[in-house]
Each structure stands twice: as C-alpha cells, then as structure tokens.
C-alpha cells in the first residue's frame, strides 16, 4: 500500500495513480524529487506556455508563472493557455485557469511583477528557474544569482523557425541506467562471437555521474581568437551567432523582431550581425543574409519542440535522472533538426 504524502516526500495513492506511467519510466525516487520541487517560469508567451504545460503534467510541487506584460493580439497564435478575448490582460493571469486545470495536484501561482525588480532573496524559494523573453543582462544577472545559491538555471527563446535552450546546473550529479555487460561462460562454443562480451538487455545497473556547467556569461563570451577556438569555429553551429544577434536586437530595441516592422527590423538585424561578428573577429559570411527571413515572431510548432526539450531538461535536472544537455541546445525549424553544443571555457 502506498503511504499518504508526508513531509519526508512520500507519494499518496492519488499521486501514484496520476503519475503511474512516469514512475514506471524514471522510478519512484525520481518522481519524489520532482514532487518536492518548485520552479519559477518567467515569460508566458508561446514557449512559456509549452514549458508550463509540460512541467505541470510532469508533476512538480509548485510552478510560479511570472510575467509583467499584457496579452497582445499576436500572442494567441502560439500561446494556447490564453482564452479568446484576453487581449489587454496580464499574460500570466490570463494563463492561470487553463494551466491549473491541467493538473490540480500542482500548486500553480502567478506573479505580475517585473523580473528586473526582484531581489536575490526572491529566487531562493525555488529549486529551478527558467527564463524566456528576457534581455541578455537579465539572463546573466539571474544566472549569477542562481549559481551563487545552487539553484538550477535554464533559459530559452523562440525566434521564428529558430529556438535555443541553455542550462547552468553548476556541479550536477545524476544517475544513468546502463545495460550490464555479461561475459560468456567458458566452454561455451556457439560461434566466433562467444569470446566477446555481450550486452544483456534484461539486466541494467544505475551509474552515478557528475558534470560541471559554466555560467551563461562565459558561454556567450567565447574568445574565438585562439588557434584552438578557430578550429572549433568550423564545428560550431551558426545558430549560436544568430542568438548573439537576436539578443543584441532585444537589448537595443527592447523587443524582438516584429513582422509589423519587417523592413526596418531586417535592416537593423543585418547591421547588428555585422557589428557582432566583427567584434568577435569572425566573418559576417558565417551568418548568411537570408537569416532575417526566418527569425520573426514565435511559431507554434517550434515552441512545441523547444518547449518540450527545455521542460524535459528541467525534469531531468530536478529528478537527477539521465545526462543533461551541457549546455546549449539549438533547433533549426527549416532543417527540422537540433544540436547540443557545449560552449564556454575549456
């Protein structure tokens, strides 16, 4: 019989039934860790809605949705938590009802204050913080706070067909399920493969591992001038540099590129591309000019993919199961593929 939930982190019968498939997938202990975790999610546009949905369904203890902006006419195109007729309402408040209905067992809260006004003490109540729609300065500042207080930090965004995620888990320990290697008994001769070790898929063992992450500031400020870095440049996805351009645009304009001002924003993006890549000592040709055609607005399918990946990484980090992405994940909707890149000091 499953015990009722206690302060020690037990799972009630009702929760065991609700999360039965997940418990079978990653185990009871992992689900207990998840049920004891509180997450802060900043930014409730399309990507934020996907992340919120996935975390609530996964069964975290609590989710605080923070957004000080109002719902715009464009938001419902990718934000499914907002009801029709919500334009002008606070974005987080407009998302609360549908978010809570996804899983009544999760404590879903709303905060309408600007993230930039929050003191360091605000963040210490959470086990993980996930930022979307934030400026580079805010991303760096909150990451530093989380790193200092051993809070798991995530950030991500969607720009048109492109999306990214980043994680800084500090020194992160996790367990990974490995298939046992079974040696063939001596004297058994059934072919040339008998001398090799074989994998027995019916037997597995849990292996403890540790990985160390770098701060987002270091990951965004890679020095590409060294010979080693120049060699690595050939293997680095251009989406990393596209992210630098889009974050600079957001800083300069206080918003993301908009289809309402397509011509103006396209010209500015090209100028920022030249400035950013020149400052890094990299040829602008690394990011072809046609990138401006594919980075406007949030696209619902891209939000679904990136939001699924980002929420999955948060769940893995909180449950301490399976290797995390270290540290960037980039998704290209035009090519239909994603790539994990580890960027920062080596």
Curated annotation (Swiss-Prot):
The modification N-acetylmethionine is found at residue 1. It is found in: Nucleus. The modification N-acetylvaline is found at residue 2. Pfam families: ThiF (PF00899). Expression level increases during S phase and drops in G2 phase (at protein level). CDD domains: Aos1_SUMO. The modification Phosphoserine is found at residue 12. Keywords: Acetylation, Ligase, Nucleus, Phosphoprotein, Ubl conjugation pathway. The modification N6-acetyllysine is found at residue 198. One of its GO terms (cellular component) is nucleoplasm. Heterodimer of SAE1 and UBA2/SAE2. The heterodimer corresponds to the two domains that are encoded on a single polypeptide chain in ubiquitin-activating enzyme E1. Interacts with UBE2I. GO terms for biological process: positive regulation of protein sumoylation; positive regulation of protein targeting to mitochondrion; protein sumoylation. Disulfide bonds: none annotated. Pathway: Protein modification; protein sumoylation. This is SUMO-activating enzyme subunit 1. Belongs to the ubiquitin-activating E1 family. It comes from Homo sapiens. The lineage of its organism: Eukaryota, Metazoa, Chordata, Craniata, Vertebrata. One of its GO terms (molecular function) is ubiquitin activating enzyme activity. The heterodimer acts as an E1 ligase for SUMO1, SUMO2, SUMO3, and probably SUMO4. It mediates ATP-dependent activation of SUMO proteins followed by formation of a thioester bond between a SUMO protein and a conserved active site cysteine residue on UBA2/SAE2.
């Amino acid at each position: 019989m499953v015990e009722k939930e206690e302060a020690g982190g037990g799972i009630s019968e009702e929760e065991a039934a609700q999360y039965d498939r997940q418990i079978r997938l990653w185990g009871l202990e992992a689900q207990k860790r998840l049920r004891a975790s509180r997450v802060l999610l900043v930014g409730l546009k399309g990507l934020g809605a996907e992340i919120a949905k996935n975390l609530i369904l996964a069964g975290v203890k609590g989710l605080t949705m923070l957004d000080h902006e109002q719902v715009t006419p464009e938001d419902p195109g990718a934000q499914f938590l907002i009801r029709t007729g919500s334009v002008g309402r606070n974005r987080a408040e407009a998302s609360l009802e549908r978010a809570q209905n996804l899983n009544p067992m999760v404590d879903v809260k709303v905060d309408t204050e600007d993230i930039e006004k929050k003191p360091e003490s605000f963040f210490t109540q959470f086990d993980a913080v996930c930022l979307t729609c934030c400026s580079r300065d805010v991303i760096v500042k909150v990451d530093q706070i989380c790193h200092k207080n051993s809070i798991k930090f995530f950030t991500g965004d969607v720009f048109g067909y492109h999306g990214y995620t980043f994680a800084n888990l500090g020194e992160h320990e996790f367990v990974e399920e490995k298939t046992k290697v079974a040696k063939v008994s001596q004297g058994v001769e059934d072919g040339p493969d008998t001398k090799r070790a074989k994998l027995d898929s019916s037997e597995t063992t849990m292996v403890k591992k540790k990985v160390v992450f770098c701060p987002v500031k270091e990951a965004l400020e890679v020095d590409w001038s060294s010979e080693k870095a120049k060699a690595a440049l050939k293997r680095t996805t251009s989406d990393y540099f596209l992210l630098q351009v889009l974050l600079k645009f957001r800083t300069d304009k206080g918003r993301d590129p908009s289809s309402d001002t397509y011509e103006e924003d396209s010209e500015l993006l090209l100028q920022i591309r030249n400035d950013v890549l020149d400052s890094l000592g990299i040829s602008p040709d690394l990011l072809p000019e046609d990138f401006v055609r594919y980075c406007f607005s949030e696209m619902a399918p891209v939000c679904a993919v990136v939001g699924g990946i980002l929420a999955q990484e948060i769940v893995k980090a909180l449950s301490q199961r399976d290797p995390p992405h270290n540290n960037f994940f980039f998704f290209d909707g035009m090519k239909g593929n994603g790539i994990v890149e580890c960027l920062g000091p080596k």
